[in-house]
Amino acid sequence: LATGMVLVIITGKIDLSVGSVVALTGAIAAWAYNKTDGSMLSAVTIALFAGVVIGAVQGYWVAYLKVPAFIVTLGGMLGWRGLTYIFTDIQPIGLMDDGFKTITTGFVNPVFMDAKNFALLLGIVVVGLMLTSDWMRRQKRVKLGFDNLPLPLFALKNLFVAAVVMWVFYKFSMDRGVPIIICLIAVLVVAMTYVMNNTVFGRNVYAIGGNAKAAKLSGINAERTEFYVFVLMGVLAALAGVVFTAYMNQAQPAAGNMFELDAISAVFIGGASATGGVGTILGSIIGGLVMGVINNGMSLMSLGQEYQLVVKAVVLLVAVWYDLYNNKKSA
């Protein structure tokens, strides 16, 4: 959710409906899985298509009808949740078997080698790609005359990152291999990072968030870009709905409750600006990990739900305040 929410916030908008979209698309996925006799591909495709439709509806209202995103997605939060209750009759939809759960509990098991050895090989490949990419980025900055970390610090940073990544993959190799969900998240992060950093669409998103009027004057179709941002958010929310349904092994009418708060908090913790124009995919993932640690920590402390909500509210307020404080200080 955070990888899509960061795009919405970069454009200066917000999406309060993602939790309800998770619930509705998760219910659709469970229903489709049962109706197609356990066809995971059909269930996921139908759920993602529902996410496209939901995102397109909200995007049209925001981008072309010029209704504030806060109002549109607030209505979506209520409307999609209501449709979920109607669709499920306020009852969980159980899955016909455990096949769907493979998305969250399965492991990559290649036919050409042992899963544990594959985990180590994949770790080496990932580290190699990360180091190569960082070195090429550094060389490009040197060529353009930009400031860089001193070479010893650069090497130390990359050595630390490589050690952490290899440790993670080593732990995978000691278990049953690389979890499918980890591969899914990794592919999503890499794809979204590439889109934001190397495509016209990604640069347009940043331009609109930085100065929408200037972006329009420079020839950017702001309405179309904002529309696609909300469509993409709908697809990612649907993907989250599929994963959550697989994790729970059933679709719950109350699924996704307060997910929008966690996603928004993750984006701001990850460095996005409340005024738009600033934010990264990697930052939102780091913010999501921080929120996950906070949630797990509070659960381990047996902290009541009411206190957990207060803590999350404080975290969100502090993250936004810190961003505004930095902006004011730099100005």
Residue ranges and their predicted role:
Residues 128-140, 285-331:
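C-terminal transmembrane helix and the adjacent membrane-cytosol boundary/short C-terminal tail
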Residues 135-149, 190-230:
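Membrane-helix/interface signature in polytopic inner-membrane proteins
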Residues 77-196, 253:
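Transmembrane helix-bundle core of multi-pass membrane transporters
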Residues 1-36, 60-70, 196, 214, ...:
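Single transmembrane alpha-helix segments in multi-pass membrane proteins
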Residues 20-24, 41-49, 71-74, 119-120, ...:
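Hydrophobic alpha-helical transmembrane segments
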Residues 69, 98-99, 113-123, 177-183, ...:
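Loop-to-transmembrane alpha-helix initiation sites
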Residues 55, 230-243, 247-313:
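Transmembrane alpha-helical segments in multi-pass inner-membrane proteins
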Residues 37-77, 286-287, 291:
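Alpha-helical transmembrane segments within multi-pass membrane transporters and channels
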